Regions:
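Cys-nucleophile CN-hydrolase/nitrilase-fold catalytic domain and related Cys-dependent amidase chemistry
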Residues: 19, 28-108, 115
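Short, basic, glycine/proline-bearing loop/turn elements
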Residues: 11-17, 57-63, 147-150
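Short beta-strand segments enriched in small/hydrophobic residues
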Residues: 2-14
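Short, glycine/acidic-enriched loop or turn micro-motifs at the edges of active sites
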Residues: 15, 48, 160
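Residue-level recognition of beta-strand->loop/alpha-helix junctions
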Residues: 12-14, 44, 117
């Protein structure tokens, strides 16, 4: 098997409480990464909002969405336009009362390939993630994309290989 190089771009933003503004900043970041040659663009954890898990507030559940859903549709169209793979962490509403910290993978043709749900959920001062997220149930996943096979972990999962 021949070695090949895949250029990865990372988008890290300063988020606000405005979801639409954060999405626009993210789209701009993905465009910049693609212009610089990135083939795979990875977004920060829960990029659509401020990090809300530092407080327990039922209002924050309004930030959750279905996956696939509005954000994956927007990002899928962007992936197709730019010909890049996008790896995006989203607050998933699976069903009423059932929420996950989930990463969606969108291929370079805009296709939604699948998702990974964070399995290890911290609960420490300023990290009240168990208030919001149910542990993932999909196992560790590897996604075949146009450019590479991609395995996904979210934050604390890295400590449990």
């Amino acid at each position: 098997m021949a070695n090949k190089t895949v250029k990865v771009g990372l988008v890290q933003l300063s988020c606000s409480g405005n979801v639409a503004e954060n999405m626009e900043k993210t789209i701009a970041g993905v465009r910049t990464a693609a212009q610089k040659g990135a083939q795979v663009v990875v977004l920060q954890e829960l990029f659509r909002s401020l990090y809300f898990c530092d407080v327990e507030d039922y209002e924050n559940f309004k930030l959750a969405e279905a996956i696939p859903g509005p954000s994956t549709e927007t990002l899928g169209a962007l992936a197709k336009e730019l010909g890049v793979v996008i790896v995006a962490s989203l607050f998933e509403k699976r069903a009423e009362g059932l929420y996950h910290n989930t990463t969606a993978v969108l291929d370079a043709d805009g296709t939604y390939i699948g998702k990974y749900r964070k399995m290890h959920i911290p609960d420490d001062p300023a990290f009240y993630e168990k208030f919001y997220f149910t542990p993932g149930d999909l196992g560790y996943k590897v996604f075949q994309t146009k450019f590479a096979k991609i395995g996904v972990l979210i934050c604390w999962d890295q400590w449990y290989p």
